[in-house]
Amino acid sequence: MEINKYLRQSKYSQTLLINQASLTRAENNQTVYKFGFGQSPFPVPTEITKALANAAHRKEYMSVQGHLPLREAIVNFHQQQENKHWHSDNIIVGSGSKILLFCVMAAFEQAEVLLPAPSWVSYAPQGKLAGHKVTWLTTSFNEKWQLTAPQLDEYCQNRTTPEIPLILVFNYPSNPTGQTYSAKQLSALAVVMKKHNIIVIADEIYSLLTFTNDYSTLEQFYPEGCIVSSGLSKWCGAGGWRLGFMHIPPQLNHLLNTVVGVASETYSCAPAPIQIAATTAYERLDVANSFLTAQRKLLNEISLHCTTQLQNVGVMVHPAQGGFYLFPEFSAFSEKLTKHGINTSEQFTLAVMEETGVALLPGSAFGMEESSLTARLAFVDFDGEQVFDEQINEYNFEKVKDGITQLCVWLAKL
């Protein structure tokens, strides 16, 4: 039996692998600092879990495009939170934003998928599963791991296959870097995107966890070619509920129809009870606002602590601007690491895990060269329940502090 070559090339997700390694270490009663898996530490607010419990009896198939009251709630929510002007007809709901990303890619018979390196681990495998060419556009520490307009323009102008459609998957705040883009940067990028007719999937799953109030979106500058992807998993702490959505602009209605068709032949619809509960999540702006304020405050505090400690021992790292992640570069230690037989990011993260119990994900999992001594650090190994305790004056994230200390001590002793 011959397996499809794209499926044959597909590997198990690196994030899930590191999570399994962490669990195995913990089962052997060894200390592990789970900085490898970017799952929200915050519990789903009680009002929303009650809505799910009350909807448990809902067993019907819903519209492939999504429950209309949910789509309307999403539109209103993002208008209030981010001043977006959408219509429910242009929203499609799915079982997580991940499957919707794949549905968009699968809608194209042939395309080239552009990814800034580093980017989230699943974008490239999805592009390959859809049968497309995947091209990495490598970024640098000095550019804050961000794609620049001149870089994108230069690549597009020198393409050898200009007839093939371009899809750029663009995530901000970024997983894995924690960095986001300014309005000036997005405006410059939009000029290039329009020039080369690029269809952009703007993955804004972390947008509501931006630490400041000046969050900008590509959609402001390129509404006709920008698909926005988001969902419940990060801001609402409901990753396992698998509820995501996309806004596909009216100018791409033909693509929306195709994506709905792909959805109908794959997951059919998001589960009815989850859609009902999600409607409550998007309708309860009061709950969302207080929850988001507490999350942002705690995440920013932890990010700054981790950044300061790492910088103090010579690690190159930018403080996060949103989300759960830092993307430190350890090139300052390259000579010392080489003496220990460590020359790749994978070797580095394996050594760190074995010698300190700190679980990191190698930069190579995010499209960086294997020789790049980078890693993603997810600073979410703490009790998120505390954000609901109104009596708390000071947040507790001692395990994160301990893990960072272990990593810094290990580096200092190299």
Model-derived regions: residue spans:
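Conserved glycine-rich beta-strand-loop-beta hairpin in the small C-terminal domain of fold type I
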Residues: 296-307, 311, 317-336
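Conserved core segment of the aminotransferase class I/II
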Residues: 227-297, 304-310, 405
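PLP-dependent enzyme catalytic core of the Aspartate aminotransferase-like
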Residues: 338-342, 351-360, 366-414
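Helix C-cap/helix->beta junction micro-motif
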Residues: 28, 130, 195-196, 313, ...
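Hydrophobic residues in well-ordered beta-strands that form the structural core
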Residues: 115, 136, 200-202, 362
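Active-site phosphate-binding strand-loop segment of PLP-dependent enzymes
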Residues: 141-213
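N-terminal small-domain helix-loop-helix segment of the aminotransferase-like
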Residues: 3-95, 284, 383-386, 414
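PLP-dependent aminotransferase-like
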Residues: 106-170
